[in-house]
């Protein structure tokens, strides 16, 4: 939906790349747009989802403090080490975030799950 796309762009959640008169979206941008569309079907709007983008940026900023020094080394294997570390940190962040959401949602579940 064009209106939703405009809202997502205006919120800074995705930024198309201009190629002449065309706007191009990366595969990750398209995935983000599809997920936002699904949230929108549940009545969760772009304004609320922008919070998740800010949290993701803050999370990556935290990882950067550990990964960037490794990227900057002159060692030929440093880039691979930094990429592996970043992948590991992203995976741990996903696990922690998912678990914390489940913990926070316990009150809605009647504390049936611990």
Question: Where are the predicted features?
Answer:
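Arg/Lys-rich, alpha-helical DNA-contact motif
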Residues: 2-114
């Amino acid at each position: 939906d064009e209106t939703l796309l405009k809202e997502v762009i205006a919120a800074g959640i995705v930024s198309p790349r201009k190629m002449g008169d065309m706007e191009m979206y990366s595969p990750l941008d398209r995935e983000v747009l599809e997920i936002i569309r699904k949230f929108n079907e549940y009545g969760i709007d772009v304004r609320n989802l922008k919070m998740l983008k800010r949290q993701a940026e803050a999370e990556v900023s935290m990882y950067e403090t550990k990964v960037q020094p490794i990227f900057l080394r002159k060692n030929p294997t440093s880039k691979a080490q930094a990429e592996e570390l970043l992948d590991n940190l992203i995976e741990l962040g996903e696990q922690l975030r998912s678990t914390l959401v489940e913990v926070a949602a316990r009150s809605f579940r009647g504390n049936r799950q611990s």
